[in-house]
Curated annotation (Swiss-Prot):
HAMAP family: 16SrRNA_methyltr_H
GO BP annotations listed: rRNA base methylation
Physiological role: Specifically methylates the N4 position of cytidine in position 1402 (C1402) of 16S rRNA.
Protein name as it appears in the record: Ribosomal RNA small subunit methyltransferase H
Pfam families recorded: Methyltransf_5 (PF01795)
InterPro entries the record matches: RsmH, SAM-dep_MeTrfase_MraW_recog, SAM-dependent_MTases_sf
EC number: 2.1.1.199
Organism: Salmonella paratyphi B (strain ATCC BAA-1250 / SPB7)
Length: 313
């Protein structure tokens, strides 16, 4: 039985407004979650509008299946495959907007059985889709010490990555860890300098979660796919929650807004320039939550919304 964990959608109005909804448009909510963005999009669509929602979490799919609306459809899978979902429906180049709310959701964090949080003891799982791939416990029990250290450093920006990785491997050698509390305790004991404002396991849990779910690769693939999926004038509205996510989104929008970089003085014909094409996107800026939203929902504090528009190139 699925418990009803509350989820407060971050930057709800701003993200949907960023899509510049047309009543007859076709939109994608790539991270359905508990449906906050999807329901607001549906409220702004007319009878001819369509919304395609995606999520790889079975609990999110169960919530989505309660929406009885002919304009709405839900797909169980990763948003990195959005180009395939769109092609199957013969909608390539016809999508008017894509919304992505990246990272882990509040219901996932709050449900101890999902294993995402060091604040609640539960199975050491961390998979967005518990039916596929390796759990965090399975990966940590089989990975080399150097690989664990690399993941902690790369995806958690953990300064004590090597020390923590060694402690994890030694603990698993004695008795394999299967619980979130066990991992949190091992990390805390291996951390020589404590941050009074942050739990010592914060960065480790983030890094392992990102690795287990291939989160950054998912984002990069979805962004790349968006260029073929969006119609001219179609919008990208993307919320990120930490610097690694935002860096990828920011870099992508910046690069696609510049167009091809041609060395100064390189002789090229008009035909060659035309073949290279122009810029693919027009960056429309970023937004961050206001003081009121952060006060009501502290998890919104680190969120950043970036919006871009598909050009006619």
């Amino acid at each position: 039985m699925m418990e009803n964990f509350k989820h407060t959608t971050v930057l709800l109005d701003e993200a949907v407004n960023g899509l510049n909804i047309r009543p007859d448009g076709i939109y994608i909510d790539g991270t359905f979650g508990r449906g906050g963005h999807s329901r607001l999009i549906l409220s702004q669509l007319g009878e001819e509008g369509r919304l395609l929602a995606i999520d790889r979490d079975p609990q999110a799919i169960a919530v989505a299946q309660t929406i009885n609306d002919p304009r709405f459809s839900i797909i169980h899978g990763p948003f990195s495959a959005l180009a395939d979902y769109v092609a199957e429906r013969e909608l390539t180049g016809k999508i008017d907007g894509i919304l992505l709310d990246l990272g882990v959701s509040s219901p996932q964090l709050d449900d101890a059985e999902r294993g995402f949080s060091f604040m609640r003891d539960g199975p050491l799982d961390m998979r967005m889709d518990p039916t596929r791939g390796q759990s965090a416990a399975e990966w940590l029990q089989t990975a080399e010490e150097a690989d664990i250290a690399w993941v902690l450093k790369t995806f958690g920006e953990e300064r004590f990555a090597k020390r923590i990785a060694r402690a994890i491997v030694e603990r698993n050698r004695e008795q394999p860890m299967t619980r979130t509390k066990e991992l949190a305790e091992v990390v805390a004991a291996a951390t020589p300098v404590k941050d009074k404002f942050k739990h010592p396991a914060t960065r480790t849990f983030q890094a392992v979660r990102i690795w287990v779910n291939s989160e950054l690769e998912e984002i990069e693939q979805a962004l790349k796919s968006s260029l073929s999926v969006l119609a001219p004038g179609g919008r990208l509205s993307i919320i990120s929650f930490h610097s690694l996510e935002d860096r990828i989104v920011k870099r992508f929008m910046r690069e696609q807004s510049r167009g091809p970089q041609i060395p100064a003085g390189l002789p090229m014909t008009e035909a060659q320039l035309k073949k290279l094409g122009g810029r693919e996107l027009r960056a429309l800026g970023k937004l961050m939550p206001g003081e009121k939203e952060v006060a009501e929902n502290p998890r919104a504090r680190s969120s950043v919304l970036r919006i871009a528009e598909r050009t006619n190139a």
